[in-house]
């Protein structure tokens, strides 16, 4: 759904260690038995050459749209790197927002902070090491997909940073108004399944301090 980029819009190659496309190939494609792997040319990822027409490639490969979007929500309410309030996904209305396809994104600072806690960047809040730019599918690609699977389960980033922030943004996505200010809220208008863990669903309440 997305990939890192630099400030000039150059897409990170799959040889870049934290590459999302590289992780897709390693953790998905290469886990198939060699005799069961689909042809490599059927595995699509971002490059400098295809970013301008990636939405068209999705529609061409999927006979009109993607069959399935598998996703989770970011702290800022994004899906993929469709961050709210960015120039890339600026729109005057929700209807216009839903027509926007793949593009280069100057990520919001909260997204960068969240990503800095991922194991690929050391799970340590190292903002200097964490990319500030990306390329991403757009609302058009997500909204038009035939089916959707969302996961809300309070995971961990590496060995630290329990993602308790998910509780609030998940509630906004699932139960709040459908708005471009919470891009992931568009899933409310889509066919699909949202998995919500018991830990995620429990009430938001004050936590007791533990004496050390």
Regions found by a protein language model. Name each.
Residues 9, 14-26, 60-65, 87, ...:
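Structured catalytic/translocation cores of nucleotide/phosphate-coupled proteins
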Residues 1-14, 65-68, 79-107, 132-133, ...:
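Active-site histidine-anchored catalytic micro-motif
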Residues 105-145, 150-151, 164-165:
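Catalytic cores of processing enzymes, dominated by hydrolases/peptidases
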Residues 137-212:
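ATP/nucleoside-binding phosphotransfer catalytic cores, i.e., glycine-rich phosphate-binding loops
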Residues 71-75:
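Glycine-rich beta-strand-to-loop/alpha-helix junction loops that act as flexible
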């Amino acid at each position: 759904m997305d990939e890192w980029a630099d400030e000039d819009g150059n897409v990170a190659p799959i040889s870049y260690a934290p590459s999302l496309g590289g992780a897709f190939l390693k953790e998905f494609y290469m886990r198939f038995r060699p005799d069961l792997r689909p042809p490599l040319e059927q595995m699509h990822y971002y490059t400098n050459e295809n970013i301008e027409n990636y939405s068209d490639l999705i529609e061409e490969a999927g006979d009109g749209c993607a069959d399935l979007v598998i996703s989770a929500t970011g702290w800022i309410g994004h899906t993929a790197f469709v961050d709210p309030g960015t120039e890339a996904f600026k729109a005057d209305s929700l209807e216009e927002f839903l027509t926007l396809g793949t593009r280069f994104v100057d990520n919001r600072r909260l997204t960068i902070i969240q990503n800095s806690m991922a194991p690929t960047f050391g799970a340590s809040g190292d903002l200097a090491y964490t990319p500030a730019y990306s390329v991403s599918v757009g609302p058009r690609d997500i909204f038009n997909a035939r089916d959707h699977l969302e996961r809300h389960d309070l995971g961990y980033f590496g060995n630290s940073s329990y993602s308790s922030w998910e509780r609030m943004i998940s509630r906004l996505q699932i139960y709040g108004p459908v708005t471009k200010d919470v891009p992931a809220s568009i899933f409310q208008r889509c066919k699909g399944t949202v998995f919500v863990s018991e830990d995620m669903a429990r009430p938001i309440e004050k936590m007791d301090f533990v004496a050390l």
